[in-house]
């Protein structure tokens, strides 16, 4: 199944894709990669997974069978052999991106340029449905945005989003290698010193233009406090996002819509909802599935709603298939707002 069909379906109903269609899509993608992608072709020959058996039952059962079939990718192998995950002769427009490197050495993964369109449809629909941004920004009241972040997918994604609202964007690239370690060991002042060019440029922009939208990480939100009266939307993700910080922001940026996102280099940003003191994030079906899992009685199982488990991804696109665990735990949370599927909540890093 190619991007033409995928984009057609997502344009019609980006946040309400049926489970039956997701299963059909996943089955097609697994078959394609088992035949055409070096890594998965090798796995298929070695393990002989029975796709007819794996794709029986509901989506939860399918997800569990994928992991119990031994299909999870080793993180160290992925970091050293990323080219093995590109389909032979793939005709699309591929770009390789890097992870942020805030926690460990950067990983490398690839996107087809058309995936940016899929991701944008999901982001735009979710932000409009949950936060009503389409009511805030239009041709009469333009979005004027500033964003901090690493170059690559992050820059491409936020650019498309701002432009879709008829806005203009200042993108300030930042070096993120080891940022979490610096924050943990030396504190916020050390982070700001490390990012001094970003700090200076941000102040210059804020003093000159009338910025009404910001996209940044928690340690950098203090840069915008002097201008909080004019900031209508703040999109926040990355190191340091937690309940205490979010409540502090709510008290400081009183008239600002605060939007939490969960970012990952292989699939981009997922939209979050802050409710009852928890952050709930929802993947962009059908290309990204996320469930917390536990290993019990010799098998991987998705946890019950409200319980915590290790975060597991299935990323399925024409250009890449990835089945993996993260060194992170999260709660399984029920559908909420416009989302018709389960999400994951309050992720916590669990460095192994």
Residue ranges and their predicted role:
Residues 130-177:
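Conserved AMP-binding loop of ANL adenylate-forming enzymes
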Residues 1-98, 104-141, 150-151:
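Nucleotide 5′-phosphate-binding alpha/beta core
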Residues 99-100, 260:
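Active-site neighborhood of phospho(di)ester-bond hydrolases with catalytic His/Asp-centered motifs
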Residues 113-114, 161-164, 275-277:
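Short secondary-structure boundary/capping segments
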Residues 116, 151-154, 242, 319:
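Alpha-helix N-cap/loop-to-helix initiation residues
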Residues 39-43, 157, 222-224, 244-245:
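Phosphate- and divalent-cation-binding pockets in alpha/beta enzyme and binding domains
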Residues 119-145, 179-188, 197-207:
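Conserved ATP-dependent adenylate/AMP-binding module captured primarily in the ANL superfamily
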Residues 1-24, 28-29, 167-352:
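Active-site glycine/GP-rich loop and adjacent strand/helix microenvironment
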């Amino acid at each position: 199944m190619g991007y033409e069909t995928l984009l057609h379906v997502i344009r019609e109903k980006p946040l309400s894709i049926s489970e039956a269609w997701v299963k059909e899509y996943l089955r097609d993608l697994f078959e394609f990669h088992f035949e055409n992608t070096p890594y998965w072709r090798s796995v298929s020959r070695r393990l002989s997974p029975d796709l007819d058996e794996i794709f029986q039952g509901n989506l939860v059962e399918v997800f569990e069978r994928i992991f119990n079939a031994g299909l999870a990718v080793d993180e160290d192998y992925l970091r050293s052999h990323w080219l093995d995950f590109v389909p032979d002769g793939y005709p699309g427009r591929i770009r390789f991106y890097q992870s942020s490197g805030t926690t460990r050495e950067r990983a490398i993964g690839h996107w087809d340029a058309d995936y940016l369109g899929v991701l944008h449809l999901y982001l735009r629909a979710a932000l409009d449905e949950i936060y009503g941004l389409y009511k805030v920004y239009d041709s009469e009241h333009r979005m004027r945005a500033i964003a901090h972040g690493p170059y690559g997918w992050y820059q491409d994604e936020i650019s498309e989003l701002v432009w879709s609202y008829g806005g203009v964007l200042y993108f300030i690239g930042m070096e993120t290698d080891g940022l979490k370690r610096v924050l943990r060991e030396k504190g916020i002042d050390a982070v700001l010193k490390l990012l001094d060019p970003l700090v200076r440029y941000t102040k210059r922009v804020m003093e000159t233009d009338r910025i009404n939208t910001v996209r940044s990480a928690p340690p950098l939100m203090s840069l915008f406090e002097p201008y909080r009266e004019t900031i209508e939307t703040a999109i926040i993700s990355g190191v340091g996002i937690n309940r205490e910080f979010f409540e502090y922001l709510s008290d400081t940026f009183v008239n600002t819509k605060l939007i939490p996102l969960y970012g990952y280099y292989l699939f981009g940003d997922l939209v979050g909802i802050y409710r009852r003191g928890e952050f709930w994030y929802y993947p962009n079906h059908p290309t990204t599935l996320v469930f917390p899992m536990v290993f019990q009685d010799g098998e991987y199982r998705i946890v019950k709603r409200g319980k915590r488990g290790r975060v597991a991804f299935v990323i399925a696109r024409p250009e890449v298939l990835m089945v993996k665990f993260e060194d992170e735990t999260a709660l399984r949370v029920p559908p909420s707002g416009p989302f018709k599927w389960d999400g994951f909540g309050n992720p916590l890093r669990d460095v192994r």
